[in-house]
């Protein structure tokens, strides 16, 4: 028996998963994220029909971190031909931690996909080549997508990440040695960390990502964000690579394209129907929100939704 999607259902799901927040660990390798209270918990759902539902801390903004990798890819898709993107970054799951150098070395500096750090850095390098003000352009895109003109970067988080960026810099320089990184590494890293430091709420994320459930169109915008084919491609990448080395487990448990961030957020998509955002800062071993995944698993079961 499936249940009707409403605020009460979402609130009930949050209460079921709340104990999991005590079992995870808030990201502490980025000092500015370590101060976020582990008990925060929110969820929001937007449908292509124009309805939005929410529960918990759905309006509190947090650092979206790697969820931004989807947005930077979408931005690049509007400025490059397909073959220009995919000759520099792959479309396959990595099976490795998101900041691994080993696979990158073995595979001649071409990242497996755009959602691991190496792949996202290549995408940011591409944006640096085509945009005069990449950070400002990303802000404009995000503000338009979610209808919130006051979306900002958390500069303290961006600065904190830059001060602890040795591994990401190593990834970028390794790719540069293989000829797969064209701009100044420091400049691109600063853009990348600002994208990760976007502050958004669950409600804003659900609205912003609705275009992926609606064949590339945001219902409130006149022009498509990306084409229907590109929307399908992004959803496919999220389904196979969006949750780092736990992407298979997420597909098994939840059955939706999803993308996580170490800020504790997860965005999920039911094509042709809805976008969902959850937030709980306590993470599992792979850097995914423990309570967030559990909430999505219960929601998928309760409303009878899966892409499989």
UniProtKB/Swiss-Prot annotation:
Organism, scientific name: Cronobacter sakazakii (strain ATCC BAA-894)
Annotated SUPFAM superfamilies: beta-lactamase/transpeptidase-like
Keywords (A to Z) from UniProt: Hydrolase
Name of the gene: glsA
Record protein name field: Glutaminase
Enzyme nomenclature, EC number: 3.5.1.2
Domain of life, source organism: Bacteria
NCBIfam families reported in the protein's UniProt record: Gln_ase (TIGR03814), PRK00971.1-1 (NF002132), PRK00971.1-2 (NF002133)
Catalysis: reaction(s): L-glutamine + H2O = L-glutamate + NH4(+)
Residues involved in substrate binding: 66, 117, 161, 168, 192, 244, 262
BP GO annotations: glutamate biosynthetic process; glutamine catabolic process
Pfam families: Glutaminase
Family: Belongs to the glutaminase family.
Subunit structure: Homotetramer.
GO MF entry, a single one: glutaminase activity
């Amino acid at each position: 028996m499936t249940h009707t999607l409403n605020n009460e259902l979402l609130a009930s799901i949050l209460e079921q998963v709340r104990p999991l927040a005590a079992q995870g660990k808030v990201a502490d390798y980025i000092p500015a994220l370590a101060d976020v209270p582990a008990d925060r918990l929110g969820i929001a759902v937007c449908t292509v029909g124009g309805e939005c539902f929410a529960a918990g801390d759905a309006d509190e903004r947090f650092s979206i971190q790697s969820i931004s990798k989807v947005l930077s890819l979408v931005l690049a898709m509007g400025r490059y031909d397909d073959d220009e993107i995919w000759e520099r970054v792959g479309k396959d799951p990595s099976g490795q931690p998101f900041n691994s150098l080993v696979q990158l070395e073995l595979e001649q500096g071409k990242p497996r996909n755009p959602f691991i750090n190496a792949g996202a850095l290549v995408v940011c390098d591409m944006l640096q080549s085509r945009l005069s003000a990449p950070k400002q352009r990303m802000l404009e895109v995000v503000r338009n997508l979610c209808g919130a003109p006051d979306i900002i970067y958390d500069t303290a988080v961006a600065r904190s990440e830059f001060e602890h960026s040795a591994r990401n810099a190593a990834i970028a320089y390794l790719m540069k040695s293989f000829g797969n990184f064209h701009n100044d590494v420091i400049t691109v890293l600063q853009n990348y960390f600002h994208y990760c430091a976007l502050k958004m709420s669950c409600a804003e994320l659900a609205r912003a990502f609705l275009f992926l459930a609606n064949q590339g169109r945001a219902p409130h915008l006149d022009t498509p964000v990306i084409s229907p084919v590109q929307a399908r491609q992004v959803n496919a990448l999220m389904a196979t690579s969006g949750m780092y080395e736990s992407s298979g487990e997420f597909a098994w448990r939840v059955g939706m394209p999803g993308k996580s961030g170490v800020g504790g957020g997860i965005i999920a998509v039911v094509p042709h129907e809805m976008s969902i955002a959850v937030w709980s800062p306590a993470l599992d071993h792979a850097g995914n929100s423990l309570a967030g995944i559990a909430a999505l698993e219960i929601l998928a079961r309760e409303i009878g939704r899966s892409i499989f």
